[in-house]
Amino acid sequence: MATLGHTFPFYAGPKPTFPMDTTLASIIMIFLTALATFIVILPGIRGKTRLFWLLRVVTSLFIGAAILAVNFSSEWSVGQVSTNTSYKAFSSEWISADIGLQVGLGGVNITLTGTPVQQLNETINYNEEFTWRLGENYAEEYAKALEKGLPDPVLYLAEKFTPRSPCGLYRQYRLAGHYTSAMLWVAFLCWLLANVMLSMPVLVYGGYMLLATGIFQLLALLFFSMATSLTSPCPLHLGASVLHTHHGPAFWITLTTGLLCVLLGLAMAVAHRMQPHRLKAFFNQSVDEDPMLEWSPEEGGLLSPRYRSMADSPKSQDIPLSEASSTKAYCKEAHPKDPDCAL
């Protein structure tokens, strides 16, 4: 105790964990901040265009956030099982636990939670990630996990995804992750271009880019499904149970967002051909139905509404020279202060 300054020794407690993936949390916060910013300026928009504008903003932000979120999500293929299994190597102790497996585009996430959490005089609550993204070495991460002495269920599932595993899950999911991620990045770029074009008087091309956004998302799902079905399923035995995987939330969110983009793109293309003026009105753009109609300041015109087209006049605007001189003389005699006579 003297070496500690006559104080009790301090042992660090368990590290606090964030309730969700920090990358996904950052993406959600960015888009929520953008949505809050648009809502703040919403009262400055008058008329029915306010609701149309809010609908466009919410839909666009949802599509962009969904594309980015699923690209970094670890829930493309998920599975969970409750079983009794061995705990650690060189030990005959068994535990009752919930074991979860989440496979993403860039790696796997393995969870082990005891039921109850307190067993064998310790807290059984593990959440380990092993990645194979560009610049990462999955084999090295697995070797470090062996050195740390992680529980047997975590090491067993992680070993199934190593490059040398006979299951072939590493090549299968790594290939699927690379191609799927590439398609999603292209879809995100198409979404950016769609937003730019929809803010310009080229709405039909914005609809085409929105259609391309949905097509690339559906292609991403196709690549993921094809790559993950190249090899036969590898059984994952944990104690007396078998862990089975299935498509996770990220897969279904991508499918929903892709179909939504395709439907919106097709709807805009049809509306541009059938009802172009209503489409422009929905996007709060000028509706130039007839070039002979009067100009309005709200439609981007430079003239006041009191200036009308020559077509609105029942008579020709060309006045003969003799009539003009007589009219001028009448003005000087009867209404000398009339502003029209001053012209």
Curated annotation (Swiss-Prot):
It is a multi-pass membrane protein. GO terms for molecular function: enzyme binding. Residues 306-343 are annotated as: Disordered. Residues 46-51, 205-206, 271-343 are cytoplasmic. It is found in: Membrane. Belongs to the DUOXA family. Residues 330-343 have a biased composition (Basic and acidic residues). Its main location: membrane. The chain crosses the membrane at residues 25-45, 52-72, 184-204, 207-227, 250-270. GO terms for cellular component: cell leading edge; endoplasmic reticulum; endoplasmic reticulum membrane; membrane; plasma membrane. The keyword Transferase does not apply. Residues 1-24, 73-183, 228-249 are extracellular. May interact with NUMB. Glycans are attached at N84, N109, N121. One of its GO terms (biological process) is protein transport. It comes from the Eukaryota. This is Dual oxidase maturation factor 1. It comes from Homo sapiens.
